[in-house]
Amino acid sequence: MDNFAPRRPALSTGLKVDIAFYPLWRSATWGFAPVSTVKVDIVIYLWAANLPFMRPDHRRYAAAALLYAAAFAYILLRWDAIPDPVPVHINIAGEADGFKPKTLINATALLVIGVIMTLALPLCVPPRSLARQTVGVPAADALPASGTAARRVEKLCDATATVMSKIVLALAALFAILNISMVVPDVNLPFWLEIVLWGTFLVYVVAVSLRISHSNNGIAPDAEEETRDHQLRYAGGMGTYSAPNDPMVAAVLPSNPGKIAVNTAHAPGKRYLWRVAASIIAIAVTCIVLPFL
């Protein structure tokens, strides 16, 4: 019977974007400028057989990559229409009040920031493996490991991954529209519409984030989790807690039932926090350094 079972096709890269520039780029002070006409060939391969097997959050990340690729391509194809110097800032009246030389980095600054955020933000999502990962602790005063506590963490990890992918996709759409509107004069959006887009994005982020706190409802605690909750009722803060006698690496604490808390007393928890810190630093450095390039 196994011979007749449907086979899942081998997964390869779900998204491939090839961008070729003709002619070659030459250095122009800080940045790059095209020698003459820019020909952009974008070839996107989406394997239909593989897409149904991609996780929903991965499909959203792939869609975000497509949006950024399309925005980059459109700016390059409309390069001759972009003014020099290129506007890089808009004041409260909706008028451009900041300009920089027309270079690729200056014309796509918002897209670059968005790409960095797309790469960094998913690293802030707690990996699902933390839920059932345990470490050895002295048996004398060890807290019990709990199956329901692990399931609670898993559900919150899944919900966080879903919310983060939705935010990344919405951010890609927003940044692509705003970047094109800023640098291409004939597709410039009214300032009030840009404010509406920002407001809609913020409302959407709040709306999808509220779903995380309700994702672990319906899980009845077992005896081990009740013991843990009693011992850890005063622990935790800012998504972390330190309990050397807890064999579990992550938990949902009674003080904040809608949030995953990572046990910083153990190495896996510390490694995850370093990953989050590196992601935040990468975003901050990009936002600070890019305006000076």
Q: Across the structure, where does each feature detected by a protein language model lie?
A:
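Alpha-helical transmembrane segments and their helix-start/interface "positive-inside/aromatic belt" motifs
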Residues: 51-67
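Select subsegments of transmembrane alpha-helices in polytopic membrane proteins
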Residues: 60-64, 158-172, 269-276
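Active-site and channel-lining beta-strand-loop segments
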Residues: 75-107, 249-253, 259-262
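Alpha-helical transmembrane segments
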Residues: 101-122, 190-204
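Membrane-water interface of transmembrane alpha-helices
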Residues: 119-142, 208-221
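Membrane-proximal soluble regions of multi-pass membrane proteins
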Residues: 216-265
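Juxtamembrane boundary at the C-terminal end of a transmembrane helix
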Residues: 285-293
